[in-house]
C-alpha cells in the first residue's frame, strides 16, 4: 500500500530545516594541502571547536593520527593568506606554528620541537626539502626591520635552525622547487604593483657546492604572463603552468626552450592566493595527472608528455584541487553538488575510490539539498556572465500558491576567485528554508580564461556589480524568483559588490556584508604588502586612483542607499579593517535606514570559530525575516536592528 505524502504550503523563508546554523558550523571542517609521503598521506584539518586551529593529520597502514596536538596551529601568515604551512617527508614533518611563526619539527608520535629562533619577526611558507644539505628551502617574510612592508626572500633553514638568504631583491617569491638531483632550484617571483595572476617570472639557478644559488637565469614570464606551479618531472625536466595563450596551460622547459605541452581552452592553474597549491603531479616521466577547469567546472585527466594528448578520468567531482600522486595513487580534494569537499585517494590501477576525510562527516538527507544549475545570461555591454542557480529544496514544504521565492545573490570574494558547484551547507541553509540562491561568477572570476579574468581590470565595483544585478533581473524576468524580494550578500571583495549594488542600483531590497570593502582609499592605506597595489589593477592607475576611488567607494555615496543592511566584522581583521564596516554603519544610522552590526572578537578575515558561524547565520536569517515581514521562529535569537519598525 502506498501512502500519499504532501508538502505543506508555507511562506518561503519560514520553512523548518534540519540544516541549522549549528549543523553548518559543525560541518565546516576545513581540509587542506594533502601531501603523500611514500604510502602515507598527510593533510591539514581544521578544528572549529578549537578556535579554527589547523592540525596536521597522517594516514598510513596503522590508521589515522594527529601529529600536531593542541595548542599547535599549523598555519603560515606569509602574505597574510598563508598556505604551504608544512612539509612531510620520510615520516618527519616541518611546520609553521601560527602563534609564534616559528618552524617546528615533529617525527611520528613525538612532541614538536622548535627549529628556528624565537622573536625573530620571520614568517615561513612553501618549504622544499634539500636533504643532501640538511636544510629546507622556503619563502621567508621578514617583519623585523621596522619598514612599512616586510622583506620577502628565498631562504635556507638548516636543520639546526640557521637561516641563510639564497635569493633576494624581488618584492615576492613563491614555489621554490629543487630538481631531483638537487643541483638546480626553480622559483617564481614578481614585483609590485602586480598580483601573481597578472604577471610572474620563472627563474632557474644552479646550486653551488656551498649551497648558494648561482648562474641565475630567467626562463619565462613577465608583467603580462602569469606563471604558477613549477614542478620537476622524475627525469629532471622543468614544467610549469602559464597563461601566455590566454589560458593557464601546461608548458615545459627543455634544451633552453619553452614548449607548450597541452594547449586547450581550459585552466590548469588557479590564482596563487595561497602557497602550496597543486593542480598537477607526475605519475611518471610520460604521464601527468592534472585537474583542469572548463566553464567553471573541474575535471581530472592524464596528459601525455609525448604528444600532449589529454585523457579524461572519471570522478564524482566537479571541483578538484591539490592534486598529488605517489606511485599510482592520486590524492586530491574533491567536491560536487551533493559532495562536500573531501580528501580522496584514487588508484589509477583500478581500485575503488577511497575517502580519507570528510569536511562534513554527516550529510543531511539529499532531499534537503538543492542541486545547482549552471547558467549563463546576458549582462551589461553585451557581456555574458556565469553563475550557479539553486532553487529552494525541502521535502516537507512548498511555497504558497502563486508565491515565488526570495532570491539571495552571492558575490564571491577575491575578487579574483570563483564560485563552484561544490556542496556548501552555508548555501543549503538558505535553500532548505525557501530561499533561492544565485552564486555568481562575475566578469573577473577565474575558471574562464585570462580574458574573462581581466574583465575586472580597472572595473571592480562596476562589472561585478552589473553581473550580479543582471543575474537577479534575469531570474526575475523568467519567473523563477520574486522581483520584490531580491537580496545580495558577499564577503570581503564580495562585500564591495554588495555595497555598490545597493548604492548604485535599485534592484535589491536588502543586503548583508561580511567584512566588506566600503572605502577603496582606506583599503589602500590599511592594506598589507601582498595586496598593497591590488587596487591599481582593480580600479585605476595611481594618477587617476583618488578620483576613481571616490567615484566607486560606497561610503562616498551613502546618500543613495535606500535598503536595509546587516554588517558582520571580525575585530582582528588586518585585510579589511573594522573601520570599513563601521563607516557604512554610521552612514546608514545617519540616514535612519534599518541597519544591524555584529562584531566578533578574536576573528580576522574569515570567521573560523563555530560560535561565530552560528551567530552570523542566525542573525542574517533573523534580519531577512524581519525585513520581509515573515514570522520569526521562536528559537531564533533576536538581534538589534536599528531604525526598523516593529
Model feature map: region roles:
Residues 1-40, 46-55:
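Sequence/structural signature of beta-propeller modules
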Residues 19-25, 65-76, 112-117, 162-167, ...:
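A short beta-strand motif characteristic of beta-propeller blades
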Residues 26-40, 73-93, 120-136, 170-185, ...:
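Conserved beta-propeller blade repeats
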Residues 45-55, 74-80, 95-103, 117-123, ...:
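A flexible loop/linker signature enriched in serine peptidases of the S9 family
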Residues 442-646:
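Active-site-proximal cap/loop segments of hydrolase catalytic domains
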Amino acid at each position: 500500500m502506498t501512502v500519499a505524502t504532501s508538502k505543506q504550503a508555507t511562506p518561503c523563508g519560514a520553512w523548518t530545516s534540519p540544516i541549522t546554523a549549528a549543523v553548518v558550523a559543525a560541518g565546516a571542517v576545513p581540509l587542506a594541502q594533502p601531501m603523500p609521503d611514500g604510502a602515507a598521506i598527510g593533510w591539514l584539518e581544521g578544528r572549529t571547536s578549537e578556535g579554527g586551529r589547523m592540525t596536521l593529520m597522517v594516514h598510513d597502514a596503522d590508521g589515522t593520527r594527529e601529529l600536531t596536538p593542541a595548542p599547535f596551529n599549523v598555519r603560515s601568515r606569509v602574505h597574510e593568506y598563508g598556505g604551504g604551512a608544512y612539509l612531510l617527508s620520510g615520516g618527519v614533518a616541518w611546520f609553521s606554528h601560527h602563534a609564534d611563526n616559528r618552524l617546528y619539527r615533529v617525527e611520528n608520535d613525538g612532541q614538536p620541537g622548535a627549529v628556528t629562533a624565537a622573536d625573530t619577526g620571520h614568517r615561513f611558507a612553501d618549504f622544499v626539502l634539500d636533504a643532501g644539505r640538511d636544510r629546507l628551502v622556503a619563502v621567508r617574510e621578514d617583519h623585523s626591520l621596522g619598514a612599512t612592508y616586510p622583506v620577502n626572500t628565498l631562504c635556507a633553514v638548516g636543520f639546526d635552525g640557521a637561516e641563510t638568504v639564497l635569493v633576494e631583491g624581488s618584492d615576492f617569491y613563491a614555489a621554490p622547487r629543487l630538481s631531483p638531483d638537487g643541483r638546480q632550484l626553480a622559483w617564481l617571483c614578481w614585483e609590485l604593483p602586480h598580483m601573481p595572476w597578472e604577471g610572474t617570472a620563472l627563474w632557474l639557478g644552479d646550486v653551488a657546492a656551498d649551497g648558494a644559488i648561482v648562474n641565475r637565469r630567467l626562463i619565462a614570464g613577465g608583467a603580462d604572463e602569469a606563471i604558477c606551479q613549477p614542478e620537476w618531472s622524475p627525469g629532471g625536466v622543468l614544467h610549469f603552468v602559464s597563461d601566455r595563450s590566454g589560458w593557464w596551460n601546461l608548458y615545459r622547459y627543455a634544451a633552453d626552450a619553452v614548449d607548450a605541452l597541452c594547449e586547450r581552452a581550459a585552466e590548469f592553474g588557479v590564482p596563487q592566493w595561497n602557497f602550496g597549491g597543486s593542480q598537477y603531479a607526475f605519475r611518471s616521466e610520460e604521464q601527468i595527472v592534472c585537474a583542469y577547469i572548463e566553464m567553471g567546472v573541474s575535471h581530472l585527466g592524464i596528459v601525455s608528455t609525448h604528444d600532449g594528448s589529454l585523457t579524461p578520468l572519471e570522478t564524482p567531482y566537479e571541483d578538484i584541487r591539490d592534486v598529488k600522486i605517489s606511485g599510482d595513487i592520486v590524492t586530491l580534494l574533491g567536491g560536487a553538488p551533493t559532495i562536500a569537499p573531501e580528501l580522496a585517494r584514487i588508484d589509477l590501477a583500478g581500485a575503488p575510490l577511497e575517502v580519507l576525510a570528510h569536511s562534513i562527516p554527516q550529510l543531511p538527507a539529499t532531499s534537503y539539498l538543492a542541486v545547482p544549475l549552471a547558467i549563463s545570461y546576458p549582462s551589461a555591454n553585451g557581456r555574458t556572465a556565469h553563475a550557479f542557480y539553486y532553487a529552494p529544496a525541502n521535502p516537507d514544504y512548498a511555497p504558497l500558491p502563486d508565491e515565488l521565492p526570495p532570491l539571495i545573490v552571492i558575490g564571491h570574494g577575491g575578487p579574483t576567485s570563483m564560485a563552484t558547484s561544490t556542496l556548501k551547507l552555508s548555501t543549503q541553509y538558505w535553500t532548505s528554508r525557501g530561499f533561492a540562491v544565485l552564486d555568481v561568477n562575475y566578469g573577473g572570476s577565474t575558471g574562464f580564461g585570462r580574458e574573462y579574468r581581466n574583465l575586472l581590470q580597472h572595473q571592480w565595483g562596476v562589472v561585478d556589480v552589473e553581473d550580479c544585478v543582471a543575474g537577479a533581473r534575469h531570474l526575475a524576468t523568467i519567473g523563477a524568483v520574486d522581483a520584490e524580494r531580491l537580496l545580495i550578500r558577499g564577503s570581503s571583495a564580495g562585500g564591495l559588490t554588495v555595497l555598490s549594488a545597493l548604492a548604485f542600483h535599485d534592484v535589491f531590497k536588502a543586503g548583508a556584508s561580511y567584512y566588506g570593502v566600503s572605502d577603496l582609499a582606506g583599503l589602500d592605506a590599511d592594506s598589507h604588502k601582498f595586496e598593497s597595489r591590488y587596487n591599481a589593477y582593480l580600479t585605476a592607475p595611481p594618477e587617476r586612483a583618488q578620483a576613481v576611488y571616490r567615484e566607486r567607494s560606497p561610503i562616498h555615496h551613502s546618500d543613495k542607499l535606500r535598503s536595509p543592511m546587516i554588517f558582520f566584522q571580525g575585530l582582528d581583521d588586518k585585510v579589511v579593517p573594522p573601520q570599513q564596516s563601521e563607516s557604512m554603519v554610521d552612514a546608514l544610522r545617519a540616514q535612519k535606514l534599518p541597519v544591524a552590526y555584529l562584531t566578533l572578537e578574536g576573528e580576522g578575515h574569515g570567521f573560523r570559530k563555530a560560535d561565530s558561524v552560528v551567530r552570523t547565520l542566525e542573525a542574517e536569517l533573523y534580519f531577512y525575516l524581519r525585513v520581509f515581514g515573515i514570522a520569526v521562529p521562536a528559537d531564533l535569537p533576536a538581534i538589534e536592528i536599528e531604525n526598523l519598525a516593529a
